[in-house]
């Protein structure tokens, strides 16, 4: 009965696989770069940086404003002037209760080093946003590649388990026939059934694990969750090896740290620029009206008269003392510069160590993969010979099951070695700046 159910499940899965879209690694990477939601936030930050540049550039352009106002001086102010011309020491004049004004105002910086440096800082921040996006894209490529390799590995594992189940089912049928003819013990049949049940559990676990891996892959590349996908069968004989050209010191991670150091230096310059004077051009075009009764503005007469006042000039601002605020900013910026230098030096040394270890890992995993492949093929041959001898009544059931277990271990070791080989090569592709090979 179990065999019938297993056969039915394989048939259903075979029909289900026909509806799957088979995606190559390059297709998954392209989809991820175009659709990944987290990466889109980095794209948004790049766009935001462009707007920041425009915002800072606007501070160097003329600023034109229109203003208007109406005041009710219910206690009118007075002005006091010399009254000797009128035969008294002071002349006191009370202003009218209502006054209104309309003006056009112009202000444009002629020299402002802080505004120029702020614009330069915004360009550096834009560069940081771009580098952060590129680094996030590289991290996404590595993440998708590992998921893809893992799904391939699980698919291979499922295929091997299915083959092992088929072999054990044949062995069970033979053992059952031997038992029916008093040529084998009932315990031998039970032993095969136990191993067969263990393989069925492994198969179910591997299928569940594969489903979860595909779900995660679909999430990362923003593929419709209700549609099925499948990975291509790996070509274990051909791995696109990374060229061992040494650590690429223009990796986006290192460029980010260098740019952060540049940003800290420019922030220090911005604090120093605060000591410099600023010069601005100013101008105004103003009309003002006064009256003792607001209704007079709606009738012609002497009280309904607007007085024009125009002017142009320059304003100079020279910082003298700010309570040592700028000095503290300069010292803080210097600490940021020193920390940025240390971070870059530490990252560079760390990545050089990573590269050296990755080269060793690749060579070691390459050897392990070759050995485990040979060991896996050898274990299959041994199992086949022992199985044939068992059919002939020469070998015992214990020998068959022991060789079957050894073959299963060799198969798992082979799959693990292949996955480790791919991951170590992926690490080197990243450290040498060759990840673009995977997209092609």
What are these regions, as identified by a protein language model?
Residues 40-44, 57-58, 110-137, 187, ...:
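Sec/SRP-type N-terminal targeting helices
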Residues 67-104, 282-318:
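Small/polar, glycine/serine/threonine/aspartate-rich low-complexity segments that form flexible
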Residues 179-183, 390-394, 431:
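A short glycine-centered flexible hinge/capping loop motif at secondary-structure junctions
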Residues 187, 392-416:
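Short terminal targeting/anchoring segments
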